[in-house]
Amino acid sequence: MRITATASLCLKSGMISVFITNLGKYNEGELVGEWLELPATSKEIEHCLMRIGIDGIHYEEYFLTDYESSIDGLSSYISEYSLLDELNELASRLAMLSPDEINLYQAAIEIGSSTSSIHDLIHLADNLDSFQQLAGVYNEYDLGYYWIEESGCYDLAQLGHLSHYFDYERYGRDVCLEQGGIFHSGGYVYHTGG
């Protein structure tokens, strides 16, 4: 099999990179493809397809033979059959997010609330407000302490010295299980609904 790659593997500033392969050439025993960094303009996509021989006349079909993302967990949703337009839409939405929102997005993917497709990931990028992040909360003790001491939900002053016997870690574990949240580099994240 002859291999022709017109660009090197390198995820630069894009959110998603895909190696697009000419299916017709592949079936003829030749691997002709190119890395494309997403998001990309329609012209960039068109030029990439032309460079690998997808001209709509001799060769019309392509598939994705490799892919990577700067977003943790995202690559597991991409397959060789993923739609390029859909991936580009996702990358465009992600490019508009701030670094803090990207961090929240990665945690939301890890939580896995109703994300089973690229379409779901696009929807998730548009609905990050349905997740709450508690910065500085990195373990069950911190979570229990936050909800008891800092959230204002409880008035421990009424308990007097009994409040010293409260098991923050155990309470935090229960809260985490109830909320289905996770601890990650930015703190604790949980789904609030929506």
Model regions and ranges:
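Conserved aromatic
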Residues: 39-42, 138, 165
